Amino acid sequence: FHSQINENEFSKIVLSRCSIENSYDPISPEDLFERACYLYPRMFVALVHTEQSGTWLTASPEILLEGSERHWRTIALAGTMKLEGRQLDFDEKSETISKETIRWSDKDREEQRFVAAYITECLEQYSQNVAEEGPITVRAGNLVHLRSNFDFTLPKTSELGDLINTLHPTP
């Protein structure tokens, strides 16, 4: 892996972290879920439990896939910037702060284009009718991301599982 990084074999690398927290006070998973929903109203929040993996709570600004019958939607979310100072007033749905206050680097824009191109390529395997909008700046907590929206038709809903496997994980 290290040699591949040194030889620039990767176009993009995404690092993530897992946090395991211990509580000395009893707290129910339902209470944690409700608190996460309250703290992150614009995010997809999920509480999952399986015998094999235990209980997981996640909050993500990403929507893998949504829709019904033939009309579907997904997003490309890439580029991340922490909001600071006056930027914390940013709300993409209002004009309380100018969008020019959020300045995206060339690296972030390139990363967004990379992910959007990948999603377009995936969708075109299953649909002849793919429409892309964006990228736009969206907020998730104290962060902002670049997001492109994709609307498309899925003529064969029997291919839904294959499409999900193709889309996930995105680069």
What is each residue range found by the language model?
Residues 17, 22-114:
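An anion-binding catalytic pocket shared by soluble metabolic enzymes
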Residues 12, 71, 143:
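A residue-level signal for beta-strand positions that form part of recognition/binding surfaces
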Residues 1-5, 36-40, 123:
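Hydrophobic, Leu/Ile/Phe/Ala-enriched alpha-helical segments that form helix-helix packing faces
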Residues 3, 21-22, 75-171:
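Contiguous alpha-helical scaffold segments within structured protein domains
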Residues 11-17, 47-50, 134, 161-162:
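Short coil/turn segments at secondary-structure boundaries
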